[in-house]
Amino acid sequence: VGGPGIVPRGGRQVVTALPARGEVWWCELPEAGRRPVVVLSRDAAIPRLRRALIGPCTTRIRGIPTEVRLEPGDDPVPRVSAVNLDAVESVAIATLVERLGRLGDERMHQICEAIEVAVGCRP
């Protein structure tokens, strides 16, 4: 079955960890394929909705205010990439297939600032 939540195993169900805000996961996106994403949803919403708001990562780095650059070693990503906050979307948590790690507080602060720009709350 894959992904977090309740996974059947040998006639019984095993609860696996849910994603949490600030974590980076491999995600199976229908249009973009498998790519790392950053979970943006507040933790309380994820188990209720069974969905998470995510920011997809891309290796096409444009250096614009709605992106946050991620670096292997500093961040849990396999390659230098950027979180694209112009492409935020809600996905079923079943599409989150493998946890890569958690971003630090400073990186999440940068992401919050980029979201403000992406939605027009800050120029």
Annotate the PLM regions.
Residues 1-123:
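Conserved functional hotspots at enzyme active or ligand-binding sites that engage polyanionic ligands
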